[in-house]
Amino acid sequence: LRLLTNEAGCTLEVVGSPWPRSLNLLESGDIDLMLTVSYTEERNQFAEFLGVHYMEESVLVIDKQYASRIRKLTDIGLLPGFVGVLRDAYYGEEFEQVKADPDFQQYLLYANTLTQKLNMLKRQRVLGSVEDKTQFIEWNRQYPELAQRYQIVLTLHRAPVYIVASRQGVSKELRQHLKNSWAKVYGSPEHLAILAEFGWSLDESDTA
């Protein structure tokens, strides 16, 4: 965000907030910008999608002793425990359809923050979780016990995630200025350096 606001000549104030609350604050105009937001028609009603941040790959990670049971998403129902998911996160259309099934919902354990979801894995409250692939790889580096216990079994969704601006809180003129500013820095050495730091990619084919 600082790369964007510096280019746009704006001042950035970072506000910490759980993901579901951040979406609500963006919709009401109480915060102006968010990072790493997947596109949905519902979100487009209250958020202007300024430009792609990076390509995200959502994966299902499962306890290795149960990994052989999972061949498709609905096989979660074969597990003797829960799968952790981030509340209000978007993991692709297939997941949206499946999670609407009451029989499937009982296997999902919701977290309000990434930290809560990480703790579910560390404390073995869940048998797996849906994660951003780069996030899971980073957690494996930081916490070797996770790498020993969990493995990626399915890729659920590959799609760009965006920087967005509140339609309620940010004027149309400023939203356009921000969009133009992001276009100037997108793919620049500074942008690529940020992506490399977190293991992210601009190219969808890189995540295949």
Regions found by a protein language model. Name each.
Residues 1-41, 45, 110-111, 197, ...:
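Extracytoplasmic small-molecule ligand-binding "clamshell" domains
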Residues 20-32, 74, 114-135, 142:
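Short helices/loops that flank or line small-molecule/ion binding pockets
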Residues 55-59, 145-179, 201-207:
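Periplasmic-binding protein-like
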Residues 63-83, 172-173:
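Flexible hinge/capping segments at coil-to-helix
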